């Protein structure tokens, strides 16, 4: 009986061990994948930096590797008793990694510059805050909350204990630093050097509280790297598990350091992509500052009568969009549901139904009271006056000699002398080098849309500068179409109302879809480029991963068209010149031209089309029917001159050289929501061309109200310049 009593625990232990072994064997593949996932997100990166040590006894390990990711994985595994990796340097040119048991905060260690080196430091060892219970904290705080110095972990004086470094490997019980080896409530703690106080917690703040946020957190640059549900953030310079466009080199002013929470696109608060493949992104839990003290450079200038910059500081009472349609109240969900509410954007002054720019769009805007037009810009609000000095330009700015050296997207201009080879590629004359000073905005190629400059960003090789025309120097009105014309031929959804179904020969027509839902039309002008309206992408920092370009389809609902359709991702947006309402979409890969997919020609620059020329618009938009069939439709319009167009609009419209007017041949036909971005196609000398782009109008196909389109011929040189220079 005694023998059986002794044997029972042994048998029980064997049973438990066998059960654990079976569990180990049955670990799913997904968990194994998780263990092998990239660990670079656990490190803080310092570009072009290396470490030098004064103590020759400090060991360094080195090995040739393929990438910084491999360096990180090996560093995390190097947590032995004699060597614990706290940082590494990756030599990009030699593909070599150097692992260090110290970091930049260690005594006798200095940072140094190295063009080919990138320093990565394990954030657990350098952060001055904790996440959750602080079980991963490995910082150097060694004072308790009440100010008592901590007792070393390997000492038994004045308090005996069992928390020995050898018993808690991996918990970094070094020196007398505060730790939480068991992950207990209260956070990191230590035994104290006071015989009367055995142990006490340390005063280490939560990472969510180290830096508070003001407004919606657009200027937040704190160290929070977990979402509000506890998911670890994905690094901004990584594309796995989620592909995105917010690359640090593309947006140098957005603070895309490592994997910290940020708000680059006007969301209600900071967020990040997550390492969970099933959760693309989540918000982060960051406290709001008690006082709205914020860097003055981050605060837009408040105006009430005009727009400064992109109008983020506009606080006036204009409450209609550019064509007179009243705005929907921000606190209303009718007729359009949305999340840009006064509660979510408390500091954006979303009062009443006034035009505002809460999300960093191109200018103030609002949801409209028209159920068929979701969003409209308030472009009738004038720009604030610019001075008549060197910070404005006349004509097309070819004689501008100011000192501005930043693009409209905030990128610093690149030196002209480093870009002369690229400049010679798209102009046919020798530029005046005396005007190309340093990296100042200039117009050496006689661009019709103003000064510009090259950038150091390969994704945005060049862009226009935020300089306005001088006061009194306005865009000229379009010529009367009765005069001789230059030949165009070379040797929210808007919908076509009451159009007739088209044939399948319009292979240049593109359906732009967001999460599989049609939102806009577009025109395939080159195998890799689509021309559409910027209203389809109102925020400059729009994430493109949920957008697709569908080509070769006649039925937007995809019925019976699986064989001929092509579905392509969008890799880049290129916004048109200021006020153009155009955007070019770079496709992730070129379209394959066949019987169902083709390109449409562009008109010659500056050409005009004769009045009364019959043209056509195409779209999948609103048809006036409750159960729309989803078929591509066409409506025929005729070109209308400036004077007649103005009469139909009760004298409220005066066309300029960037606009085109066309009226319906059939009463009640015209563009409506769902057709935004689609083309106005005209034929001249047996050549079909995209002469106009559909942009929001006043209502849908209103009788005797001709539509106003973006005149593509006015922007033809810009389109060709982008296609020639945007290579990535």
Swiss-Prot record:
PROSITE patterns, A to Z: KRINGLE_1, KRINGLE_2, PAN, TRYPSIN_DOM
Post-translational modifications reported in the UniProt record: The single-chain precursor undergoes proteolytic processing by TMPRSS13 resulting in an active two-chain form. The single-chain precursor undergoes proteolytic processing by HGFAC resulting in an active two-chain form.
Keyword annotations: Disulfide bond, Glycoprotein, Growth factor, Kringle, Pyrrolidone carboxylic acid, Repeat, Serine protease homolog, Signal
Domain PAN: from-to ranges: 38-124
Residue ranges of every copy of the Peptidase S1 domain listed in the record: 496-724
GO cellular component, one term: extracellular region
Gene3D superfamilies given in the database record: Hepatocyte Growth Factor, Plasminogen Kringle 4, Trypsin-like serine proteases
Pfam families: Kringle, PAN_1, Trypsin
GO molecular function: chemoattractant activity; growth factor activity; identical protein binding; serine-type endopeptidase activity
Gene Ontology biological process terms from the UniProt entry: cell chemotaxis; cell morphogenesis; cellular response to hepatocyte growth factor stimulus; epithelial cell proliferation; hepatocyte growth factor receptor signaling pathway; liver development; myoblast proliferation; negative regulation of extrinsic apoptotic signaling pathway via death domain receptors
Residue span(s) of domain Kringle: 129-207, 212-289, 306-384, 392-470
Keyword Acetylation: no
Disulfide bridge positions per record: 71-97, 75-85, 129-207, 150-190, 178-202, 212-289, 233-272, 261-284, 306-384, 327-366, 355-378, 392-470, 413-453, 441-465, 488-607, 520-536, 615-682, 645-661, 672-700
Residues listed as glycosylation sites in the UniProt record: 295, 403, 569, 656
Transcription found in the keyword field: no
Residue numbers of Pyrrolidone carboxylic acid PTMs: 33
Entry-linked SMART domains: KR, PAN_AP, Tryp_SPc
Signal peptide region: 1-32
Subunit and interaction comment: Dimer of an alpha chain and a beta chain linked by a disulfide bond. Interacts with SRPX2; the interaction increases HGF mitogenic activity.
Function description: Potent mitogen for mature parenchymal hepatocyte cells, seems to be a hepatotrophic factor, and acts as a growth factor for a broad spectrum of tissues and cell types. Activating ligand for the receptor tyrosine kinase MET by binding to it and promoting its dimerization. Activates MAPK signaling following TMPRSS13 cleavage and activation.
Family assignment from sequence similarity: Belongs to the peptidase S1 family. Plasminogen subfamily.
Name assigned to this protein: Hepatocyte growth factor
Lineage of producing organism: Eukaryota, Metazoa, Chordata, Craniata, Vertebrata
Gene: Hgf
